[in-house]
Amino acid sequence: NLFIDDYAHHPTEIENVLSAAKDSKLTNNIIAIFQPHRYSRIQSLYSEFSKCFKKADLVLVTDVYAAGEKNTNSFKIGNFIKLIDKNSKVKTIHIKSIDLISKYFDNNKKNLVIFMGAGDISNKAKEFYNKFNN
């Protein structure tokens, strides 16, 4: 398995990262782990986010890293997941814990796991990498 930690937290960045990963042909299974950053960003780019994961084979979405913001517009992660699944045409799952990621690996494939976001996802990526490789 290969692991990448990327600061991508905007739809264009996410699309570019996944496109480069697909074009690299390093693997035949790309798992995108996305931590949404700020309710205001997700809501203002809701449609764009729903379409930017097309090059992934599986998308795992964590809870929103609020960065001090309140969920004033009643953002629902379940609706966000369904829209990504529909518009990006990729299986999308909400995960509450990074520890659950390996449950989604296909051990018959070489997985490229890309952690993306601007919150504390980098710390979680390091923790997961260390746990997975020990």
PLM feature segments, named:
Residues 43, 70-71, 123-127:
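Short glycine-/acidic-enriched loop or helix-start segments at secondary-structure transitions
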